[in-house]
Amino acid sequence: SDVLKKKNVFALSVNGDSMIDACIAHGDMVLMEPVSDSYSLRNGTIVSALVPGLGTTLKYFVKKGDKVYLEAANQNYDPIVLDSNQLIIQGRLLAVWRKV
């Protein structure tokens, strides 16, 4: 698969249901491509982000001015709103693996 040919791809285990409406469920494995420059991200990209006090989270990335909104795919979760310099975007979603 082309996904596995990309450099520095990493995997994360999903913990929780914040992205369930994007068909990403608790226990899934997500393959992520490292992001070196968050300015290259388009709004609506699913990213893993390191958020102070929360750890790593998987959310939709939305940038508005100097603010970044990390939005869940589950209406039970409020967006996480931060200044763009308050978080580290670790990677963008490439694929979801689920055991059946």
Please describe what each predicted stretch is.
Residues 2-100:
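Acidic/glycine-rich C-terminal interaction modules and beta/coil loop segments
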